[in-house]
Amino acid sequence: MRVGLLFGGRSGEHEVSISSARAIASALSAGENASKYEILPFYIHKDGRWLAGEAPQQVLKSGAPLLESSNSSPAENNLVNSQQQTLERWQSPSQVAEVDVWFPILHGPNGEDGTIQGLLTLMQTPFVGSGVLGSALGMDKIAMKMAFEQAGLPQVKYKAVTRAQIWSNPCVFPKLCDEIEASLGYPCFVKPANLGSSVGISKVRSRQELEDALDNAANYDRRIIIEAGVAAREVECAVLGNDQPQASTVGEITFNSDFYDYETKYTAGKADLLIPAIIPDDISRQIQNMALQAFAAVDAAGLARVDFFYVEATGEVLINEINTLPGFTATSMYPQLWAHSGIPFPELVDKLVQLAIERHNPSH
């Protein structure tokens, strides 16, 4: 079976995508998987070009992005460029036609937000992970919160604002900040609604910091969410499956930085993953059940990692967010949670491919 491994992308998480793709390629080539799967890598350059052939192999081998000036692949392998993004260009390369199932491991905007999932749906080929709806809801923090609210899942207080409210009228901005202070207080977190891996997020403790953070977040997205801060432990649960998903052992993240930011997430030694989390059994079961509820609430499929706040003082569990395309790097929580739950990395990747095929070809 030929697996189209799609990685890179134009988002700020390009390097994370490469790291994830390398780990997945290694898992698809390990043990029994080696005789089941043939990997066809496709690399999306930072400039938007889609490359097949030698270029993706080079990136997987080196672990480094191709330079902007690189012209290492022949013209016929330049599948799509930013000037001529047409389905005709997609239909011609033989490599695309040969793919039996796609494994998109593109993090961030244009990767896990439903856009690439829409293209793969149009191609009528199975692909790993959630479809357009689940991906879009899992990416947009505001829409996600609304879905959780509808499902009755407890979460921190939040307020949604737009770039226009922040930038368009200097008379309105102070009033907006007044409302945020009154409803959420300090500390609070300001986040772009549609960026992953904690990009553009600020923790604020004062009016000046709030104003600066809102202005900064507006540079990243036209929709911004502000969440009340909470003194809590950060715990995570992985979900695997389609219509009858399973929840993993619960893990905990501990870190010394102010919050779990981009650098902390992807720098070895900056954060510790404790699996299983040392929490009461009933709390662990509650988190697993809530993870499955969240998975259903956004119509996720295949895989997701669900993040929670555990307020130890009160025993309260609050849902933070769902990530429908979690990282697969060496430091990533998702594969580690399943490894501790009895599913090693190569078996996990195999299951995800099989789930993609099952979802594409439902049976009674």
UniProtKB/Swiss-Prot annotation:
Q: How is the cofactor bound?
A: Binds 2 magnesium or manganese ions per subunit.
Q: Which coenzymes or cofactors are required?
A: Mg(2+); Mn(2+)
Q: Name one GO biological process term.
A: peptidoglycan biosynthetic process
Q: Which reaction does it catalyse?
A: 2 D-alanine + ATP = D-alanyl-D-alanine + ADP + phosphate + H(+)
Its annotated compartments are: Cytoplasm
Q: Which residues bind Mg(2+) 1?
A: D307, E321
Report the family membership. Answer: Belongs to the D-alanine--D-alanine ligase family.
Query: What is the documented function of this protein?
Result: Cell wall formation.
Name recorded for this polypeptide: D-alanine--D-alanine ligase
Q: Which gene encodes it?
A: ddl
